[in-house]
Amino acid sequence: MGIRMGRRLLLITLLLGALLCNNVAYAKFSRYSFPKDFIFGTGSAAYQYEGAYKEGGKGPSIWDTFTHIPGKILNNDTGDVANDFYHRYKEDVNLLKDMNMDAFRFSIAWTRILPNGSLSGGINREGVAFYNSLINDVIAKGMIPFVTIFHWDTPPGSGKQIRRLPERKHSNMHEKDYADFAEVCFHEFGDRVKYWTTFNEPFTYSAYGYGGGVFASGRCAPYVSKSCGAGDSSREPYLVTHHIHLSHAAVVHLYRTRYQPTQKGQIGMVVVTHWFVPYDDTAADRGAVQRSLDFMFGWFMDPLVHGDYPGTMRGWLGDRLPKFTPAQSAMVKGSYDFIGINYYTTYYAKSVPPPNSNELSYDVDSRANTTGFRNGKPIGPQFTPIFFNYPPGIREVLLYTKRRYNNPAIYITENGGNNSTVPEALRDGHRIEFHSKHLQFVNHAIRNGWGDGYLDRFGLIYVDRKTLTRYRKDSSYWIEDFLKKQY
């Protein structure tokens, strides 16, 4: 049986990011190699590209606060200006159309709509007007808007809730405020937006923001990092994720009951996963592969599909893993019309002994060590210190999802490889190879029954940080040629 499909989607995401070059000749491979109803597109996230962090009535988010702490971000970079999309979005939308894109995926900044984080603080009509103009421009250029409601930019006030966990049944994500924000989005934009995602990569938000402390909110246990002011890496990631599931399910219920019948849209969640292969061909390392998948992918997919967390997590975490009530389980189960999957890389997984019981954290709970190297050799070409080019992984993720999770409608919402040097940005043939090979393995998955969508995460466009001038890279011209329609 083939994977269940809605309208097919292939999103090739562009994070506006690095420079102009000549075309590179590759064997002919085009949109016509895919089903005719595939949609090809690009995308990014509000904090990463909008800028204008104090303009247009916008309030601060936890990322504004976090990046302004010296030393938290490499080179003390911030999103204060970013790519200045807020002022230059028409130019960028035109670039997307020039590349023959069919869709644009973007997120809505919570505090650009609700500057104080809650409905009681008032709706920022200037922010609503900005997104209305963006949506209208995307549609006017013949593209489809795909909108993410939450991409990590929580209002700072709601972050204080975590300090009272687990005594209070809240997380950093205040569920009512989030539901109010989502409803404003549905009400203001839902007549034109037909594809919604509630959360983008909640794994990253929970594990890195509350386990490792390297992302906002910057919380972790002192034995994980002395740079964290406070936190409990053994519990907070699981508590935050639990309330994300409840917030997601409540918003999906809201959309399905109040808006979907008339707006006729779809709604889902975007999750991220790596693929894993055994470090050694042993039963122990094959078990480490499954645990790695359960603790990253299953942490989100199992509740969405089955109504509870994976058995491995339940068995090993004990009371550190929150429990759903029967009513909550029923609400979370099936709370999606589609699943978005972000895939970047594959790692080896090796089984390791149980961790020190006095220094528990999300990072060690799976009892698996993951690495991109075996015997000193990388699993694939290394794009960044943590990302390796391993095209078969995208096929394996799709087919695993089909087998394990009852054949959901899937969109690959992010996939890609970054630059490490300026010359690579100027002549990015490696990215063309990345796209070409991953698309070939997507085709393999289609032949094995999958066929919903694909998206690339890293830059087809270079933005000069001093002048904010946009330059197209070789890969953008390859994509333009790949997507060219024959009339």
From Swiss-Prot:
Residues annotated as binding a beta-D-glucoside: Q48, H151, N200, E201, Y344, E414, F458
One function term, GO molecular function aspect: beta-glucosidase activity
Pfam assignment, any one: Glyco_hydro_1
The keyword Glycoprotein is annotated on this UniProt entry: yes
Residues at the active site: E201 (proton donor), E414 (nucleophile)
Origin superkingdom: Eukaryota
Glycosylation sites per record: N76, N116, N369, N418, N419
Enzyme class: hydrolase
UniProt xrefs under Gene3D superfamilies: Glycosidases
Assigned EC number: 3.2.1.21
Transmembrane segments: none
GO biological process: carbohydrate metabolic process
Disulphide bonds in the chain: C220-C228
Keywords tagged on the record: Disulfide bond, Glycoprotein, Glycosidase, Hydrolase, Signal
Annotated signal sequence range: 1-27
Catalysis performed (reactions): Hydrolysis of terminal, non-reducing beta-D-glucosyl residues with release of beta-D-glucose
Family per record: Belongs to the glycosyl hydrolase 1 family.
Protein name, UniProt field: Putative beta-glucosidase 35
Organism: Oryza sativa subsp. japonica (Rice)
